[in-house]
Swiss-Prot record:
This is Plastocyanin major isoform, chloroplastic. It comes from Arabidopsis thaliana. The gene is DRT112. It comes from the Eukaryota. Belongs to the plastocyanin family. Keywords: Chloroplast, Copper, Electron transport, Membrane, Metal-binding, Plastid, Thylakoid, Transit peptide, Transport. InterPro entries: BlueCu_1 (IPR000923), BlueCu_1_BS (IPR028871), Copper_blue_Plastocyanin (IPR001235), Cupredoxin (IPR008972), Plastocyanin (IPR002387). Residues 69-167 form the Plastocyanin-like domain. Its cofactor is Cu(2+).
Amino acid sequence: MASVTSATVAIPSFTGLKASTIKSSATVRIQTAAVASPKLTVKSSLKNFGVAAVAAAASIALAGNAMAIEVLLGGGDGSLAFIPNDFSIAKGEKIVFKNNAGYPHNVVFDEDEIPSGVDVAKISMDEQDLLNGAGETYEVALTEPGTYSFYCAPHQGAGMVGKVTVN
């Protein structure tokens, strides 16, 4: 419950006041101290470089595991499409399918158009499962190299299909 309260405030008037000045004869003394500048040696430079190189390599390795591509389900203009609808990824890279339009969508891989030996049930959503709200996601990581075709079951007839190539 919101409420509004009002109050009256009296503000005093300071008209007719005069500013006064005080003369001071204080002396301020500042002393400075000499600071030795740090010396850079080749040994410490190489050590710092080595630490930085190891940290950079670790960051790249961790970032490589966290790599993901985002595929939008539906265009900003209301179109029924995967955006992008044809792309390539590295083996094991995560694909995040994100409903950005709020229409019911899903991601189903075509069992006839995936590499042999891949279990379509392990990588697809069930055709009856839907991502209904904007921002809902479905994630999958494809580990077998090859070409995978996928579609949105409710909108496949409208051309909402895509293809991913795993390198």
